[in-house]
């Protein structure tokens, strides 16, 4: 069912269903759910009733991957789609969300994927498009662009593009750890998206890091890409059990196929210089 994006698709899937989730889910999902499921420091969610649970395949903030139980009510594939070799039937879910702009396609188009025989009540009624489940003239150009982006994403996966991105991410984390050994990398050691590094450097506010790196030409954030620009504590890190101070000092770095090793080296050089100056001021205070 084509929609204006994953946010609309989430509402179409979840409205009136009484679904539960953990507070690490994207707000497009959690705002429709009862957010009472527990989550550990590893980002894993305890899911005892999958048929009444919404769960993301990859967290939009940390990049941590979930172990999906069979029969899940809704799988949010938005962040993982295009970066991992995934397919709807592989998730075992009844419904799933995807979005075009997350794979380099046009903004303003997404889809709700539904297992055959699943009832979906239309929220937009009128002309009966999308088999009566989402009325309104389809964004044909956007949908075509979505298809082209999906084909390109498949080629990138086949060519090992994201494996190279993962190598760069690991080089970045190793270099940062050598420069500042106390840095915490959220989800490191577990299964994560290949492009995401979420770093905590206690005593160095996330929004300060963002501004300093921005002045050096690096686009980073203190939260998920959808929430960048909003200065507030990460509810994802809070739900995982990190302290308020740790959550306030988090920096999210997201890499792409266009990045090269010299980008990583320059990033680490700039980040480490700021971090060392901060440590020096503390020692002299």
Whereabouts are the PLM-identified features?
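Pyridoxal 5′-phosphate
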Residues: 1-285
């Amino acid at each position: 069912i084509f929609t204006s994006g994953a946010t609309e698709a989430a509402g179409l899937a979840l409205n009136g269903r009484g679904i539960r989730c953990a507070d690490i889910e994207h707000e497009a999902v959690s705002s429709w759910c009862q957010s009472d499921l527990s989550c550990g420091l590893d980002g894993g969610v305890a899911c005892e009733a999958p048929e009444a649970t919404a769960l993301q395949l990859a967290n939009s903030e940390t990049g941590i991957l979930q172990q999906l139980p069979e029969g899940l009510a809704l799988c949010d594939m938005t962040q993982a789609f295009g970066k991992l070799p995934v397919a709807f039937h592989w998730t075992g879910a009844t419904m799933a969300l995807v979005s075009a702009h997350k794979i380099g396609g046009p903004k303003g188009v997404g889809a709700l994927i539904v297992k055959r025989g699943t009832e979906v009540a239309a929220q937009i009624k009128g002309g009966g498009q999308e088999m009566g489940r989402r009325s309104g003239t389809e964004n044909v150009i956007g949908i075509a662009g979505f298809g082209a982006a999906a084909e390109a994403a498949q080629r990138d996966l086949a060519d090992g593009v994201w494996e190279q991105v993962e190598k760069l991410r690991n080089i970045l984390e190793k270099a940062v750890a050598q420069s500042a050994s106390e840095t915490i990398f959220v989800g490191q050691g577990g299964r994560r998206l290949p492009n995401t590094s979420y770093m905590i450097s206690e005593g160095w506010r996330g929004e300060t890091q963002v501004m300093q790196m921005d002045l050096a030409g690096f686009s980073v954030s203190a939260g998920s890409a959808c929430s960048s620009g909003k200065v507030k504590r990460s509810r994802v890190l809070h739900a995982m059990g990190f302290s308020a101070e740790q959550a306030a000092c988090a920096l999210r770095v997201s890499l792409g196929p266009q990045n090269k090793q010299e980008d990583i080296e320059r990033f680490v050089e700039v980040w480490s210089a700021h971090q060392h100056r901060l440590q020096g001021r503390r020692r002299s205070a």
